[in-house]
Amino acid sequence: MFTDYVRILAKAGKGGNGCISFCREAFRPHGGPDGGDGGKGGDVILEVNPQLSDLSHFLFSPHQFAEDGQPGKGQKRKGRDGKNLKLEVPPGVVVYQLDPNRIFHSSRDLLPIPKPGEPLKKIGELIEPGMRFILCKGGKGGRGNFQFRSPINQSPRYCEEGEEGQSGQFLLELKTIADVGFVGLPNSGKSTLLRQVTDAKPKTAPYPFTTLKPHVGIVNFDDGYRMSCADIPGLIEGAHQGKGLGFYFLRHIERSHLLVYVLDLADPFLDPVQVFYTLRNELEKYNKELLKKPFLIVGNKVDLVAADSLNHKSLDFNKRTGLSFLPISALKAQGIELFLNSCRKSFESTKKLIPSSPKVLSPLT
């Protein structure tokens, strides 16, 4: 099952306690303190693995605990540090923290998943392969009694306990990274278009809501240029209110630099102009920033439309919107070369460089 939204409870390891010990060797029956420090608790770390495509591996393991540090030992020996817990996530994950003022200790402390629209505290974002984010930092090890010796107290009989590791409950939200995002009504031919132009193989069928999860494919041009495209489940009017399936996946086109509106020209009951404005309206209700993205419009299924009808639809669309659509047939591969060249030209002229990010982000404070 495709999963792009999960809740986890993470807890870093506790630092090991310091040791109370005194040197007892031959010829030194009353040696001084030699208790070692405790080891540091393990961190909980998120790391991007480009081979992963969703977050389903967290569904049955929402509780993630790093190893505790070991206590110190005599002869000034430091306890072993706890092992870090590395959690792999796909590129494009956004990390939110729930109730940062609360300390979590067990699964009984789990909070309910917030409803869509509730404000969340964003603490990190993982985009590039290999990027790491310290979700919870392990506690420091306690000092052994050797650290407390002084001229006044040469035989301290006390030590420090290790610090508790950081803990928290987090939401991981996947936003697919794709250069181009396809938007359209159910059964408009988005999946067929994706199959035609990329290496992706989404399911296609002559009924609505065939696409139940986002699909990403790569367009390979003859000169070696590559461009990624994403197809999400179709939108319907009222999608911003939770109707249909598309609303839950609109996050997957937020990072796209170019949007492609796919219109079905073959359906006699659909007005292409009205469909276009419906799609724009749903994007605006979800996130106004999506309307600022550059876009192309394609009129699909022209193989099922008579030439005079296609010409009329094209002129009418231009007259009422001031815009034009590219006529294509995703099924018959008509107009695909022009479509891809237009996508590439628009993408190259409008894409923004993603700022470089450090490989390891700062831990929670």
UniProtKB/Swiss-Prot annotation:
CDD domains, per the entry: Obg
Primary location: cytoplasm
InterPro entries: G_OBG, GTP-bd, GTP-bd_Obg/CgtA, GTP1-OBG_CS, GTP1_OBG_dom, GTP1_OBG_dom_sf, OBG_GTPase, P-loop_NTPase
Recorded GO CC terms: cytoplasm
Residue ranges occupied by any OBG-type G domain in the UniProt entry: 178-348
Annotated compartments: Cytoplasm
Binding residues annotated for Mg(2+), in chain numbering: S191, T211
PROSITE patterns xref list: G_OBG, GTP1_OBG, OBG
Gene Ontology terms, MF aspect: GTP binding; GTPase activity; magnesium ion binding
Binding-site residues, GTP: 184-191, 209-213, 231-234, 300-303, 329-331
Pfam families named among the record's database cross-references: GTP1_OBG, MMR_HSR1
Keyword Cell membrane: no
Domain of life of the source: Bacteria
One record GO biological process: ribosome biogenesis
Keywords assigned by UniProt, alphabetized: Cytoplasm, GTP-binding, Hydrolase, Magnesium, Metal-binding, Nucleotide-binding
Domain Obg, first and last residues per copy: 1-177
Region described as Disordered: spans on this chain: 64-85
EC primary class: hydrolase
Function: An essential GTPase which binds GTP, GDP and possibly (p)ppGpp with moderate affinity, with high nucleotide exchange rates and a fairly low GTP hydrolysis rate. Plays a role in control of the cell cycle, stress response, ribosome biogenesis and in those bacteria that undergo differentiation, in morphogenesis control.
Protein name: GTPase Obg
Organism: Methylacidiphilum infernorum (isolate V4) (Methylokorus infernorum (strain V4))
